[in-house]
Amino acid sequence: MSLHLYNTLHRRVEPFEPLDPACPTMYVCGPTVYNYVHIGNARGPVVFGVLAALLRRRYGALRYARNITDVDDKINTAAQEQGVPISAITERFCAAYREDMKKLGVEPPDIEPEATAHMPQIIAMIEQLIERQHAYVAMEHVLFAVNSFADYGQLSRRDPEEMLAGARVEIAPYKRDPSDFVLWKPSSDQLPGWDSPWGRGRPGWHIECSAMAAAHLGETIDIHAGGIDLQFPHHENEIAQSRCAHGSSTFARVWMHNGMLNFEGAKMSKSLGNIETVHGLVAKHPPEALRYALLSAHYRKPLDWSEALIAQSVRTLNRLYGTLRDLAAYPAHPFIPGNIEAALDDDLNTPQALAELATLANEARIQLADTTHHAAAEVTAALTRLKAELLGAGLALGLLQQTPEAWFSQGTNESDETHIQALIDARGAAKQARDFVRADAIRAQLAAEGIVLEDTPHGVRWMKQHT
């Protein structure tokens, strides 16, 4: 099966055929760096990171850009509230975002353009829009004339009144039409600004992505992706700007949108006070469990985020890493099995891929428990294959990329491990002396410290209990 992706533009799953099979292009909308990103912001980078890896395997190369919005009124407000320079806000939270993504196993994109580094391209695109009569200057603002673009609304498929309500547009005296949106606006001395033909000012949010996508990927790109909340007005406006500036019929050939996260059944929002930041979550939970949870539902569907979901993800990874630990004697190199690739080819069906991963682990455990019924060579071959496929399936999903020992001991340091081993040895000595009361007391002491013991034919194994 070839790669098929759901195209929001056409509302259907379609075969993916890149303009240049030697190197597809993909642009994903990144964060506005005014605070720590919440877990909902991480779903896109995780999911579309899986897609990026798939495209590289399939085509041999990929040009992937994910932007940073580092000029925005939210950033200005944060700097004013905290009494620090704007650069202090953007540098701090840009670094935090990259660190959070690294912990979640998100590979960096090929290009991570920042808006402030692309002012010449942004200004040039606005000039093109004015020249082509798709934009106008009014009271030191430059605005896009929505009624100049006949295809406006083709992505969101909303009628004009619905679009006007959905955009929460500002009714301003400098607008010819309420639906027109800002490309450039004036800046006071206290706000960041750049010299332009229309005076000192700063760009609107939408034009930044259009200019950066064109600068790094060209006038027409293969895939443009982001959260469903960006479909309108942000992506709708990107299409209008880009097509009108370049005089082209297509800006992005495939539009992909990931669903939103709910928290404990309610919409995740600041007003409800139920925002969970990645920064806070990785301090409390294994980052790989957060990644697993983000992949557990199909990317286009809403995902109900909860402590129960995280706990279930931890338990699943315990089983997977436990299986790999039991396969330690069987050296193997990762091999991605066909059913994993088939699941991902089916519009990134990560839940199906995770189910296939669990099946591989179950098969391995059955083989491990049933070794007496087969010839040694046959068992070794089967377990080596299953381990290779387990590792390969994990590789395709960005999972199982650490050793079982690292997974089970995370949250501990060298002195902790020395202390734990000393107690395990003491428990072993107590059992040898048939002092089972003492042995049970040591097990209980370790449990109170968050350490779970497992007695196996190969000796005692321990793991840090994660929540």
Swiss-Prot record:
Positions of short motif 'HIGH' region: 31-41
SMART domains: DALR_2
Binding, ATP: 270
Organism classification: Bacteria, Pseudomonadati, Pseudomonadota, Gammaproteobacteria, Lysobacterales
Record key words, sorted: Aminoacyl-tRNA synthetase, ATP-binding, Cytoplasm, Ligase, Metal-binding, Nucleotide-binding, Protein biosynthesis, Zinc
Cofactor(s) needed by this chain: Zn(2+)
Protein family (similarity comment): Belongs to the class-I aminoacyl-tRNA synthetase family.
Record bears the keyword Transmembrane helix: no
EC class: ligase
Protein source organism: Xylella fastidiosa (strain 9a5c)
Pfam family, one: DALR_2
SUPFAM superfamilies the UniProt entry points to: Anticodon-binding domain of a subclass of class I aminoacyl-tRNA synthetases, Nucleotidylyl transferase
Catalytic activity entry: tRNA(Cys) + L-cysteine + ATP = L-cysteinyl-tRNA(Cys) + AMP + diphosphate
UniProt name for this protein: Cysteine--tRNA ligase
CDD domains in the record: CysRS_core
Listed NCBIfam families: cysS
Motif ('KMSKS' region): 267-271
Major subcellular location class: cytoplasm
